[in-house]
Amino acid sequence: MSSSITAPEGIINPPIDELLEATDSKYSLVIYAAKRARQINAYYSQLGEGLLEYVGPLVDTHVHEKPLSIALREINAGLLTSEPVEGPAQ
């Protein structure tokens, strides 16, 4: 008997090593992915209201896929760029 269970996405796929190539550190990756996940979540929230302030997912998504998983796949696909933010001059 075969099953049609798909491979899990998100934290295990894409691999962390590939994701770290897009940023300077694990901390930067966490902040980067969290900000994008918030944008995706806000996009879905605003769909019903007709207000589209944020850009929707840049990759194909599944019905029950979480915003963080979508953000990690976008980062891995190279669809987003991360620019370092410089602190205030002292």
Swiss-Prot record:
One of its GO terms (biological process) is DNA-templated transcription. Pfam families: RNA_pol_Rpb6. Keywords: DNA-directed RNA polymerase, Nucleotidyltransferase, Transcription, Transferase. Coiled coil: none annotated. Belongs to the RNA polymerase subunit omega family. The RNAP catalytic core consists of 2 alpha, 1 beta, 1 beta' and 1 omega subunit. When a sigma factor is associated with the core the holoenzyme is formed, which can initiate transcription. Promotes RNA polymerase assembly. Latches the N- and C-terminal regions of the beta' subunit thereby facilitating its interaction with the beta and alpha subunits. This is DNA-directed RNA polymerase subunit omega.
